[in-house]
Swiss-Prot record:
The gene is MIG1. GO terms for cellular component: nucleus. This is MADS-box MEF2 type transcription factor MIG1. The keyword Transcription regulation applies. Induction: Expressed in conidia but not in aerial hyphae or conidiophores. Disruption phenotype: Leads to reduced aerial hyphal growth and conidiation. Does not affect appressorium formation but impairs infectious growth. The MADS-box domain is essential for the function but dispensable for nuclear localization. The keyword Nucleus applies. One of its GO terms (biological process) is positive regulation of transcription by RNA polymerase II. Residues 693-702 have a biased composition (Basic and acidic residues).
Amino acid sequence: MGRRKIEIKAIKDDRNRSVTFLKRKGGLFKKAHELSVLCSVDVAVFIFGTNKKLYEYSSGDMRELITRYTYHGGATEHKGPSDFNGGDDDDEEEGDGTPPLDQPMDAHMMPPHFQGQGPFPPHVMRHYTPSASPPIPNGVPFPPHGHGVPRGHTPQPQMLSRPGSRNDARRMGQPMGPQGSPQVNGFGFGQQQSMYGPPNTTMPPHMPPQMAPGPPFPYPQHPQHPPHPPHPPHPPHPQQPHQPQMQQQFIEDGRRATMPANFAPHPPPPHGPMGMQRHSVSPPQQHPHHVPQLPPQQPQQHPHSSPPQPQHHQMQSPPQPMVKFESPQQIEPPQHQHQQQPEPQEPRPEQQQQQQQSQQSQQPQEPQSEPARSLPPPPPPLEVKTELAPPAQPGRIPQPSLLDTAVKKLPRQKQHSIFTPIDENRSILSQHLAAFHAEPSKNKSSPPAHHRSSSVDESTSNASEASRGKDKDIASSPPLLKRADPRASISSVSSAPESAPAPPSRSNSLRAGPPRPRLKVQIPDEQSEDGSGSATAESASSAQGGASTDATSQSTRQNDSHSSTNMVLPPPSPSASALLSAGATGPPNPFAPKRPPQHPAPGLNIDTPVSALPSRFLNNEFLPSPSSFYPDWNFRGGDNNTLPSPLNFATPVVGTGPSFLRDENPGASLKRKSPDNLSIHGPISDNPLEAGNEPKRVKVDS
């Protein structure tokens, strides 16, 4: 008569398991609700499904319940799977539970991840629960505040099966609880993260968890770091002096750590505190707290300082092409270094030298790299930035080859930074802009061209390419402007005394070819004459520079005139009626000046097919001159205050028959025109239609 009992074992079929899960989960939540209402108790149910989804029911505020559970004393009653071996209750999704609190667990009843350890000492369990944060199944119970009693049987591996009773709530408790320490890795605490990361087997066998400092600051967010309690060889008392300090550091770690315990998979070093130090790599504020611990932990400082080194390189590498950004970044790493290592500073100068040598190879700029290497403390890199401008002048001459390499290497470095704009060495727009914006600097640098004029004449294209890269450097940062000057002197070809021809020679390879045909087609005559006159004058003045300078000066002057006329050309184009055809242009420009209707011959425009005309002109395709009709279009309806529309053509043609006849369409459209507009059309329509239209026009106007 009663319900059929099923055997309580894992369901293999996925479909049956999902259906059973949904039904029993709903029933469990319903029972929990009934229990909470009937007995006025607080109930919280957590279910971690096999799909890693979390299902929960809580009769009140879940965070409050979790906090109360976390800080509560030992459970009065605790049930696990062993209590329901033959029963109907189901915990099938997670299966395993923690042992009852008061009696030891038999070996045959232990879950698989408890097999390797003996029964729990009750006093350890009692000490464990008051400050409980990590679940017991992970095998890392912790000594509470004053007790240094590490358990001797904790090294079992973490398994995916989680206990379904109180430890699930505890595992869930940390992410949801209102404790002050924010989550770092997004999971509740380390034991749950170890499901996805490497297991906690890397911990030393007798290492209690990092939670020990007590309830006010649960630290589960810093999972896999073997915490402060000492390694088994050390007696518990070394832990005591470090505990308050470690607690403070853990608090700071939870608030400031920006990396989700990426260094945790490393096997922990002998001291527990160092595992924490490994995690606190990024925030430099924590390092002052490490200072008191340096004497016992000098061997640890070096592994701890090793993670920040790639970090400092990453900090410096993106802005290296920009000298401005480089010097402030150089200031920061020494500060980190001094904060991190008050005592072992031996590796730091070497690291700085390596960093600066890499910077020197990437931007071979000797005036900057040598002071930066010789002065490791923070202020001198600022001096490097300020000193760059004067020393670059004497150092220009020996550096053209270095600048070539710098121009080639800069784009690679700039790609590493998100803050730098598009690579200037590869931006064609910046090349053309720099060609004109950098001309004053070129003119300044043309006198030094005496030194290089002999070697430069043979390769003007190379000089132009080099100057192209140089102009990007000038645009990027002021200190690089001095560095760019050698390029300018290279690009100013043998005509050194004349500063005017130097810019044309510079932009020869960039702009020489294409603009000339454009000049012939687009530039009006008077402007082209001016441009050609200036070009010939410049070429005559630069005759000593050779044929190449003549050509480049002409091309550059043409480019200048072309750039000035580009802004002049577009306005006349809409109103140039000589270029307009009736079918091709569409509606006219209403703001264009009216053209006298006498230039276009009527025969020229009638040839356009009717299909090419706009639809509103289809009734009037045989007007003698549509091109003269367009400018008058918007002024046609001035008398009756109506905008033009196709209906204006159709309505007058009431009794005149089909509208496609040649005799009637012009008349039909002209019937509604005012005498003023007819006078405008007068020169075109000198045919007999006008005389015939006179009486009709009088009728319409009256």
